[in-house]
Amino acid sequence: MVLVSRVTVYNVRYLYTEIGKILGLDTVHPMIILGAGNLGQALANYVDFEKRGFKLVGIFDVNPVLEGIAVRGIEIQMLSDLPLFLKENEVEIAILTLPKNKAKEMAKILIDNGIKAIWNFAHIDLDAPEDVMVENVHLSESLMTLSYNLSEYRKEHEGM
């Protein structure tokens, strides 16, 4: 008996490059962070963003104590400086890590100044015009999903 299997050989580097193009990772995406608290600074310090073409160009906060402090070489600026910064710099993506009472106001400023992509970690869902992409991130929902999966795993493996 002869078994014949079909073997497909893939050029992994080529596939990686092509998938990167589909995801838009073949260009640099300048981005800013609004909110320089714990989450904002953690995101600012995440070096893998740059490896994927996301370049941090500005960090903003409302707290004057943080003004001028550098995070990875970028000085924290005041939120009041944001409109001028957006006029003078190319920014594609804004990351919101602000309290919910500031998020909607800042989102409006971002949208009014041409930002087309917002990654929102504020504890409020943002609505935006059709030409603006918003990714509302809910950390607690992700944690609940993990909890559910853990619970299901335990049920399946009880008594083993």
What are these regions (language model features)?
Residues 98, 121-123:
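Short secondary-structure boundary segments
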Residues 1-97, 102-113, 129-154, 160:
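Hydrophobic, well-ordered beta-alpha structural blocks that scaffold small-molecule cofactor pockets
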